[in-house]
Amino acid sequence: MEANQTNQDNRPLRILASHPDTGTLRLIRDSISNLLNIEVDTSPSSEYAFQLAVKRHYSLFLFGIDMPNLNGQLLYDMLVTIYPKIHPEASSFPGVVFIGNENESIKSDEIRKDARVKDFIIRPLSIDRIVRVIKNSIQVNES
């Protein structure tokens, strides 16, 4: 098996995914780790995802737009505020891909105006779509 992907800081690429549906998280984790050889941390709790982001450096975030207690946009805004202070060695702030349902597609145009938002994907997800979005969002070395 090849070595894990690395970014420009020569750190292993790592993605944090948070969504209330554990089936969605399993599909994301298995697709990315098996097909792209990128480490993925997952949590159905946005509060725990926040704690993980404080502890580790990530290359990309995938957040559910409609999360209980702390929605994906608010979670990302909170991380934008503190991430550079707790990870000063990082050369850039991770982008985000939001995951929504069909009824949330209206929000996607407004959300995509932020340059840090790499994509807004609608469920149900497919393996091909997940892999394509990740490849378009971060620099992935082709083997």
State where each predicted segment sits.
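A short, hydrophobic beta-strand element within the central beta-sheet of small alpha/beta folds
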Residues: 86-106
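Alpha4 helix (beta4-alpha4-beta5 surface) of REC/receiver domains from two-component response regulators
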Residues: 74, 100-120, 132
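Acidic, metal-coordinating helix/loop segments flanking the phosphotransfer/catalytic sites
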Residues: 44-60
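Active-site residues of response regulator receiver
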Residues: 64-66
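Two-component/phosphorelay signaling modules centered on CheY-like receiver
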Residues: 22-41, 48
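Acidic catalytic/metal-coordinating carboxylates
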Residues: 45, 71-77
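Non-catalytic signal-transmission and effector/linker regions of two-component phosphorelay proteins
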Residues: 1-30, 77, 82, 86-93, ...
